[in-house]
Amino acid sequence: MLNERQLKIVDLLEQQPRTPGELAQQTGVSGRTILRDIDYLNFTLNGKARIFASGSAGYQLEIFERRSFFQLLQKHDNDDRLLALLLLNTFTPRAQLASALNLPETWVAERLPRLKQRYERTCCLASRPGLGHFIDETEEKRVILLANLLRKDPFLIPLAGITRDNLQHLSTACDNQHRWPLMQGDYLSSLILAIYALRNQLTDEWPQYPGDEIKQIVEHSGLFLGDNAVRTLTGLIEKQHQQAQVISADNVQGLLQRVPGIASLNIIDAQLVENITGHLLRCLAAPVWIAEHRQSSMNNLKAAWPAAFDMSLHFITLLREQLDIPLFDSDLIGLYFACALERHQNERQPIILLSDQNAIATINQLAIERDVLNCRVIIARSLSELVAIREEIEPLLIINNSHYLLDDAVNNYITVKNIITAAGIEQIKHFLATAFIRQQPERFFSAPGSFHYSNVRGESWQHITRQICAQLVAQHHITADEAQRIIAREGEGENLIVNRLAIPHCWSEQERRFRGFFITLAQPVEVNNEVINHVLIACAAADARHELKIFSYLASILCQHPAEIIAGLTGYEAFMELLHKG
């Protein structure tokens, strides 16, 4: 069995590469122990995944067979079995949990608070003196939670008292049903297993629904359920099916049009509407409160497309105002918005091609516009023409394809000789991806407005954010409206955090230019169960697509370094040095 430390190592490496020293610091053991753990993990993972050294970045995890990998980890994860025991019993004393798990009672006592924290957004774990621990949820939700858990971790199915033959017959019957097309066969079978396991605890009254499909499926599997259990099962499935009927593409499109700032981005298309509609239908017809696999951190994706994930939060708020939907995974909707943003990245960025040979200039212009997305190549045939064009527009890049020498003050240029090659195209792509921030990060992150905030131990994140914003308003770096937007956004949850750096942000209507302010903290703070050491306040315009790439650039730079390097940044100068190195 993998121990808690080894499972934590896997968790850490799922998020990003780590050095042995960093892993040792996070787990409280020596580097030599970490290396032994990695050897044992690779042996246990048995080709489904592998941990390997990747140069200066440290060790990283590569997963080859994703489903098998997650199932193997579940076999070693006692949290699933602990939660299942709590769901299967009305009350469970700690000694009984320890006996069922064949683990010391001290382990259970230590694990219960962590289990509560792990599932705090999913269910409420409570205790009652003299009775024991229990899941404080409605009967309906307890059934769905247990069904999700049995579907996620097949090793728990014997706890429900089901034989292998029963399970095989049940799976076949559920796969062949067609009455509820939005519900997959394995989801239906997990619901039946949960009802069967809880059949003697069901007290809710459900109406009688027409049809006997469920009864036939249960009988085909060789199981027996009483009338009350069959009514509960049928009622639960029909309720979920009827809830899904209220969702339509027109509903979704109407809500999307009400999301603040979405009109200027022009990203509402048939694909986005179809993706979100399908997701909502699945959420209603087959709720999944417990994910079917371990969730990796979404922070890097949220940092790359913050506008998308913020729009998803606004959309979900509007959705909940209009419909009572148990939506439990906002991250997927954020990904759908991110995909829509990528599909509509049609703003063509200006590139000046300085060339004194007409034929070569034309060939190179066609090649660049064909192979480099979202760019517009303007040909300048002399230095004076280049100066004139630059007075009218600010080019993202100047390509010197001539014999002229450019002024040393021009720092956003590359030199390409003769007809451009594939290597030249790749050079242009790489430059465009990061040039505008890499060459002049001071333009976006200014020294004025970056300071040290002396927070005290126990000070809340909301209070810290308010105080920092108040200081920036007093110094006229951000407006009172922007401060209010930042504070409100932080209060919505799903805070943007990348490798020990929190990024409170807002979409400003005051200025189009990105503005970032780096603030160090006196004490580490825990936000969303993650430790942060510094704060980066950011204001940007959601429709300034080009400058939104700063977020993804930031994420890539921050994730290149161990967490201890980010945590050790001493101030603005150290932060800027990090960006210049990128």
From Swiss-Prot:
The keyword Protease does not apply. Keywords: DNA-binding, Kinase, Phosphoprotein, Transcription, Transcription regulation, Transferase. It holds the Pfam family PTS_EIIA_2. CDD domains: PTS_IIA_fru. One of its GO terms (molecular function) is kinase activity. Residues 443-582 form the PTS EIIA type-2 domain. SUPFAM superfamilies: Phoshotransferase/anion transport protein, Winged helix' DNA-binding domain. The modification Phosphohistidine is found at H505. Its EC number is 2.7.1.-. Residues 20-39 bind DNA. Gene3D superfamilies: Mannitol-specific EII, Chain A, Winged helix-like DNA-binding domain superfamily/Winged helix DNA-binding domain. The keyword Cell wall biogenesis/degradation does not apply. Could be involved in the regulation of the transcription of the FRV operon. The PTS EIIA type-2 domain may serve a regulatory function, through its phosphorylation activity. This is Putative frv operon regulatory protein. It comes from Escherichia coli (strain K12). The gene is frvR.
